[in-house]
Regions:
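Sec-dependent N-terminal signal peptides
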Residues: 4-14
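GH16 jelly-roll
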Residues: 19-291
């Protein structure tokens, strides 16, 4: 009887643990004011005030107010050390959308090692990691990295796809275990679409683009809005297995940080410490939970 009571107590504690976070309502953060409404700032790196501002005039679109991130050359390498915003409350199954422009570093420092992350992230002590991401390495803004991380610490699992959207080339669609695990190609329903319509002259640093993902319990879809036609172009429609699809709530985020390990597909030398405070502009971010 004592063992049964202990088991019941354990499962109740798991349920309580899973329900402790407050879930966000539907929102759009326009970054039109210096004060954030649905996010908080959270960098673990230097405390330099210049690293972020909200409600500043865009240098790309003078009529727009934006969130401005500047990478600090004094920051050490590592995710979270650069500027980052984190949603005040948890987010869950729903549609996530953002409009942003990454910096162009190619004429100044072509081997810059810096990452833009548009993503969800929460490491739960019981259920492990819940991460869905879009990422760009600023040394080549024609390439998009999308995917998820799930699993407990030391047992992380990745599903991912790497795309050159200017040419429409899909470099890989894979599953791997751990950061340095062997990648295994995904096929069938986990590898759709098998071809992608190129966006002529796609360059994430040349203008603002709108990106998004739809997070379902059994499906994940990443997409971009074509800047001319307004058509939604699906970058990856992952289904056919629940493996790799986060099942617990997360925090909604945007960040900009230095990497000294992750080089480009076509340039592994692009891991240099940023020499200047390169700028990321974010026009808006939205979240619409499924009913």
């Amino acid at each position: 009887m004592k063992q049964i009571l202990l088991l019941i107590s354990f499962f109740i504690s798991l349920t309580i643990h899973a329900q402790t976070g407050k879930l966000s309502h539907s929102f759009i953060e326009n970054f039109s004011d210096s004060v954030l409404e649905n996010f908080r700032y959270g960098s673990t790196g230097t405390k330099a005030a210049f690293k972020w501002q909200s409600g500043v005039t865009s240098k790309t679109e003078p009529g727009s107010k934006v969130l401005l991130f500047k990478i600090d050359p004094m920051d050490s390498a590592g995710a979270g050390r650069g500027p980052e915003i984190i949603s005040n409350n948890f987010t869950y199954f729903g549609t996530y959308t953002a409009r942003l422009k990454v910096p162009d570093v190619r004429t100044v420092q072509p081997n810059t090692g810096a990452v833009i992350g548009y993503f969800t992230y929460f490491m739960d002590s019981v259920y492990g990691l819940s991460e869905i991401d879009f990422e760009w390495l600023v040394a080549d803004p024609s390439i998009i990295y999308i995917g998820t991380w799930t699993g407990n610490r030391g047992q992380l699992k990745r599903i991912g796809r790497t795309i050159n959207l200017d040419s429409g080339i899909i470099y890989n669609t894979i599953y791997k275990e751990g950061y340095k695990g062997e990648p295994f190609p995904l096929t069938g329903a986990q590898n759709q679409p098998e071809t992608i319509e190129a966006i002529d002259n796609y360059d994430a640093s040349s203008k603002f683009y709108t990106y998004g993902f739809d997070w379902y319990p059994d499906r994940l879809t990443w997409w971009i809005i074509h800047p001319v036609t307004g058509k939604k172009i699906v970058l990856w429609d992952y289904q056919g297995s629940q493996r790799g699809i986060p099942q617990h709530q997360s925090y909604y985020r945007m960040n900009f940080w230095h990497t000294n390990e992750w080089g480009l597909e076509n340039n592994p030398n692009a891991i240099e410490k940023p020499l200047h405070p390169y700028e990321l502009e974010v026009d808006w971010m939205s979240y619409d939970p499924f009913k």
